[in-house]
Curated annotation (Swiss-Prot):
Molecular-function annotations in GO: 3'-tRNA processing endoribonuclease activity; ribonuclease P activity; tRNA binding
Pfam families registered for this protein in UniProt: Ribonuclease_P
Organism: Buchnera aphidicola subsp. Schizaphis graminum (strain Sg)
Cystine bridges: none
NCBIfam families, alphabetized: rnpA
Function: RNaseP catalyzes the removal of the 5'-leader sequence from pre-tRNA to produce the mature 5'-terminus. It can also cleave other RNA substrates such as 4.5S RNA. The protein component plays an auxiliary but essential role in vivo by binding to the 5'-leader sequence and broadening the substrate specificity of the ribozyme.
Entry EC no(s): 3.1.26.5
This protein's UniProt keywords: Endonuclease, Hydrolase, Nuclease, RNA-binding, tRNA processing
Name of this chain's protein: Ribonuclease P protein component
């Protein structure tokens, strides 16, 4: 049975982990979201978020976007290849509703599936 938890081992926590991804990333871009990925040797995917106050002014909007990103990752983590991902949200994502954001994320995650 699959485990759909989003545990600490599935998160990028340290700046060295983020720098590892930023040093040689594999990019997948849309007009609203940019996902950087780099393979790891851990055997499972990990997620890091970079949602800046400069791009998205209000905290409740940043938190909503982070929740949606984590939720789509949590549900699809068993299909993803073993990579470290950093998700960067762009300014114009605030104009989308939740359903469109989820559809965009699922489309991008499908590029990284096994």
């Amino acid at each position: 049975m699959l485990n759909y938890f989003f545990k600490k081992k599935s998160k990028l926590l340290k700046s060295t982990n983020f720098q590892y991804v930023f040093s040689n990333p594999c990019n997948k871009n849309t007009f609203h979201i940019n996902i950087l990925g780099r393979s790891n040797l851990l055997g499972h995917p990990r997620l890091g978020l970079s949602i800046s106050r400069k791009n998205i002014k209000h905290a409740y909007r940043r938190n909503k976007i982070k929740r949606l990103i984590r939720e789509t990752f949590r549900l699809l983590q068993h299909r993803l290849i073993s990579m470290d991902f950093v998700v960067i949200a762009k300014k114009n994502i605030v104009y989308l509703n939740n359903k469109k954001i989820v559809n965009i994320l699922e489309y991008i995650w499908s590029n990284y599936q096994r």
